[in-house]
Amino acid sequence: MVVKVKQKIPLKIKRMGINGEGIGFYQKTLVFVPGALKGENIFCQITAVKRNFAEAKLLTVNKASKNRVKPACSVYETCGGCQIMHLAYPKQLDFKDDVIRQALKKFKPTGYEQFEIRPTLGMKKPDHYRAKLQFQLRSFGGTVKAGLFSQGSHRLVPIDNCLVQDQLTQDIINKITQLVDKYKLPIYNERKIAGIRTIMVRKAQASDQVQIIVVSSKEVRLANFIGELTKAFPQVKTVALNSNRSKSSEIYGDETEILWGQEAIHEEVLDYGFALSPRAFYQLNPQQTEVLYGEVVKALDVGSKDHIIDAYCGVGSIGFAFAGKVKSVRGMDIIPEAIEDAQKNAKAMGFDNAYYEAGKAEDIIPKWYKQGYRADAIIVDPPRTGLDDKLLKTILHYQPKQMVYVSCNTSTLARDLVQLTKVYDVHYIQSVDMFPHTARTEAVVKLQKRV
């Protein structure tokens, strides 16, 4: 390795990496530079030297890309929540197409060079789209601040005006910090592991109803806090307390208690409504969720005799799009509260052909097959870690005729396709921009069992 830490070097950026960083070569050494764009000539300083590459921080842009824009966010460079706000939005969509191609080229699933990769479906107004926030609380000189940890650190960046966050949720978290200060509520201390760690605020787009989770490592008295908050924001319908006494970086503990208000808020997608409890998973971008689920519906060709498995089903929202036209829908999720929501939602909509069970997909699906259930199609919407090996083996063993893979991580998607393409043909990959200004890429993959 010819470069050293703190060394300053000129660099020509050849391409962009999957995390939104610029990539160039310095005397045959691969260098990753966050904030740099393809085609730019820059000056940077080496911050880390690894076995096969180096990392650097951008110092100056000597020749800027015509696609570079000035981020409107005042904490963009320190926050780390967004990675590509300095790239013009139409080019962000092109970047996400390329991220998929890079992942496929790295893992090389069967036939990947012939896969149809459709242009990413973007937003008309790619700002204030996040309907949910999870901000950390810390004390700064005796004043409470809420925000996000800077990339790769435990240093909190206070945020009072996030440009990708729904404005109501931002207004509410700003009020919460004032009230935590006012009522002298205990703030988390990493040394003592005590106090309020995190605040979750989520808004349902259809109803404007809001739910809040206070994550704390100790008991806190919130009666006055709740009274003043709900008076200021009548949209708040639920306040819950989650107990997390763990030393780990996990946001939530296992126990969540409704302190005030209703058990769930009302949301809608694709013309059907459903209940959403505080701990249940739902997509962060309601506008693009309509687009994403619409693409899932397009990708499956099913009828009245077909049976569908909706793995990682959450509150059942994807499966409900099919329940009215198929023989049966079965779903599972590891969060019991989500399954309770799914069961209640199915009953409320009159879907007596929908069945939901709490647990891991890799455990429940083999059990269903042993009981004689046979799925004609399966929908998987796994976390960023991708499909569990046991679930992959189960799918390859039972081989449903159709499959839709909804991915939030192109690397694990490409990895899983290496196994799935042993049995299935990939008809196309359709990316949907769920997270503008970030490097995160969401994609819907249509797969058909090979004849």
From Swiss-Prot:
<dbReference type="InterPro" id="IPR012340">
    <property type="entry name" value="NA-bd_OB-fold"/>
</dbReference>
<dbReference type="Pfam" id="PF01938">
    <property type="entry name" value="TRAM"/>
</dbReference>
<protein>
    <recommendedName>
        <fullName>Uncharacterized RNA methyltransferase SpyM3_1299</fullName>
        <ecNumber>2.1.1.-</ecNumber>
    </recommendedName>
</protein>
<dbReference type="GO" id="GO:0051539">
    <property type="term" value="F:4 iron, 4 sulfur cluster binding"/>
</dbReference>
<feature type="binding site">
    <location>
        <position position="73"/>
    </location>
    <ligand>
        <name>[4Fe-4S] cluster</name>
    </ligand>
</feature>
<dbReference type="InterPro" id="IPR030390">
    <property type="entry name" value="MeTrfase_TrmA_AS"/>
</dbReference>
<feature type="binding site">
    <location>
        <position position="162"/>
    </location>
    <ligand>
        <name>[4Fe-4S] cluster</name>
    </ligand>
</feature>
<dbReference type="Pfam" id="PF05958">
    <property type="entry name" value="tRNA_U5-meth_tr"/>
</dbReference>
<dbReference type="InterPro" id="IPR029063">
    <property type="entry name" value="SAM-dependent_MTases_sf"/>
</dbReference>
<feature type="binding site">
    <location>
        <position position="79"/>
    </location>
    <ligand>
        <name>[4Fe-4S] cluster</name>
    </ligand>
</feature>
<keyword id="KW-0408">Iron</keyword>
<keyword id="KW-0004">4Fe-4S</keyword>
<comment type="similarity">
    <text>Belongs to the class I-like SAM-binding methyltransferase superfamily. RNA M5U methyltransferase family.</text>
</comment>
<dbReference type="GO" id="GO:0070041">
    <property type="term" value="F:rRNA (uridine-C5-)-methyltransferase activity"/>
</dbReference>
<feature type="active site" description="Nucleophile">
    <location>
        <position position="408"/>
    </location>
</feature>
<keyword id="KW-0489">Methyltransferase</keyword>
<dbReference type="GO" id="GO:0070475">
    <property type="term" value="P:rRNA base methylation"/>
</dbReference>
<dbReference type="InterPro" id="IPR002792">
    <property type="entry name" value="TRAM_dom"/>
</dbReference>
<feature type="binding site">
    <location>
        <position position="312"/>
    </location>
    <ligand>
        <name>S-adenosyl-L-methionine</name>
    </ligand>
</feature>
<dbReference type="InterPro" id="IPR030391">
    <property type="entry name" value="MeTrfase_TrmA_CS"/>
</dbReference>
<feature type="binding site">
    <location>
        <position position="283"/>
    </location>
    <ligand>
        <name>S-adenosyl-L-methionine</name>
    </ligand>
</feature>
<dbReference type="InterPro" id="IPR010280">
    <property type="entry name" value="U5_MeTrfase_fam"/>
</dbReference>
<feature type="binding site">
    <location>
        <position position="82"/>
    </location>
    <ligand>
        <name>[4Fe-4S] cluster</name>
    </ligand>
</feature>
<feature type="domain" description="TRAM">
    <location>
        <begin position="2"/>
        <end position="60"/>
    </location>
</feature>
<keyword id="KW-0949">S-adenosyl-L-methionine</keyword>
<feature type="binding site">
    <location>
        <position position="381"/>
    </location>
    <ligand>
        <name>S-adenosyl-L-methionine</name>
    </ligand>
</feature>
<dbReference type="GO" id="GO:0046872">
    <property type="term" value="F:metal ion binding"/>
</dbReference>
<keyword id="KW-0479">Metal-binding</keyword>
<keyword id="KW-0411">Iron-sulfur</keyword>
<keyword id="KW-0808">Transferase</keyword>
<feature type="binding site">
    <location>
        <position position="333"/>
    </location>
    <ligand>
        <name>S-adenosyl-L-methionine</name>
    </ligand>
</feature>
